[in-house]
Amino acid sequence: MVKNKKILVGILMGSASDAETMVETEKILKENKIPYEINVLSAHRNPDAVRKYTKIAEKRGIKILICGAGMAAALAGVVSSHTSLPVIGVPIETKSLQGLDSLLSTVQMPGGVPVACMAIGKAGAKNAAIFAVRILKAFK
């Protein structure tokens, strides 16, 4: 994490085990000197904490939220439903369905709940950070 700077990107993970994938997001943000923070918040186990974090993110100066989650992968959609910030979803690869469950849960959002969905796994985590960097650079 880049220290002593205003956080621009919030990385959320549904489970601590998702860190193995989301480290790819961190690498790209670090390389580009983008200040970020990481939180483990499950849409299923901690819905109130997810809502609280999401609702104050914009007031704190965060510009983009990146959400990595596996299986039912509701995190990105739930986050998007509580903010007007751009939300990027990263489907985490799973053992049972190789991440197809996560992909479909992340990409199939109802109208009015936009989530930019990346590829499954580490490639998606990397692309999420690259996409965030491009968004931030476009508005400098």
What are the language-model segments listed below?
Residues I7-R45:
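Glycine-rich phosphate/diphosphate-binding loop of Rossmann-like nucleotide-binding domains
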Residues M1-K6:
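Basic/polar N-terminal segments that are highly enriched at the extreme N-terminus
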Residues I38-R60:
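N-terminal beta-loop-helix "entrance" segment that forms/cooperates
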Residues Y53-I92:
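Glycine-rich phosphate-binding loop
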Residues N39-A43, G68-A69, I92, C117-G121:
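Glycine- and other small-residue-rich loops at beta-strand/loop junctions that grip anionic moieties
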Residues N46-D48, A69, S96-L100:
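A general structural motif
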